[in-house]
């Protein structure tokens, strides 16, 4: 079955508000084997919303509408769904009584306009809202000659998630054909989306019963594999077979076959070896340390880090010889090597990581352009240095450098 998500609210058509509900709903629908075919954002105009609902009913099996269930004049979702379906609205006395009782229990006075939240579409099942005042509604109807499922959900994310998890998921499980879903998430580092797809497309195109999607973000590729079968064992067998073939093809760049982040993998390998890592960051400004310390239990393997932006701190905290900086410059392979070795020794760690570069937008030259980054990984036996030239703005360069640095450590640990 296919679905459409309609997000209601003029604020989401401005630069100041994002529709995060659709991401959550997509994940939930996919877990049930439902494909999201369309996502639509509609402002608070009755004609536009009615048109969007009618269009959705023509082209999908399930319509999930978020927002527009509040008490104000521009909260029009109930009215628009009723108009699109040719049904009436009835104000539910029990809902009104419950609304006032809840307000009294909280010693809150509510205005009469809140009563419009008790308007129920003919034939709808009421979805209780334990986290807010606006009830949702569920409709399982025949529209034209086809069965359609519609759900009206509140806009605030905490209210929507609670209502969907506790009430819509069981209703959907009963309404949908009984299918088992198997999913796998594979991740690769420092490979372009087009390059990755060129390598694996000949493989996944042979598996027409598996939905394969590629998501790319700043040096990270996520491959989502999803298969629906009558029995879970069948679905898992197919997904695992495809995953195995992709793992073999991407062996040089793949770092996770179960959806872990790169920092989780680095910390896992460190802990398995009983080793520790220390980091000296210049252009990344603490991004690497932040990613590592965001993982619970990272203190077992992460010794510590230093942000050594100035030349003085490179010497003070990482022991870099000032003459080395004077001879080669702060952005050089020699200084990256000294950072990695110095921080490893000063933190008594097994591995040291040093990063220095030019994140821009200024500071570059013909010999050392913006985007030039040197990364080094040091052990007591050997120090490896890598030169990379990234493109993009400051944010992109810094995050790519952090991703490259973590992947460099991962490769040394394998």
From Swiss-Prot:
Q: Which regions form coiled coils?
A: none
Matching entries from CDD domains are given as: cinA
Alphabetical list of Gene3D superfamilies matching this protein: CinA-like (3.90.950.20), MoaB/Mog-like domain (3.40.980.10)
Q: Which SMART domains match?
A: MoCF_biosynth (SM00852)
Per the record, a Pfam family?
MoCF_biosynth
Name the domain of life. Answer: Bacteria
Q: Which InterPro entries does its entry note?
A: CinA, CinA-like_C, CinA_C, Competence-induced_CinA, MoaB/Mog-like_dom_sf, MoaB/Mog_dom
Q: Which family does it belong to?
A: Belongs to the CinA family.
Protein's UniProt name: CinA-like protein
Look up and give the organism this protein is from. Acidobacterium capsulatum (strain ATCC 51196 / DSM 11244 / BCRC 80197 / JCM 7670 / NBRC 15755 / NCIMB 13165 / 161)
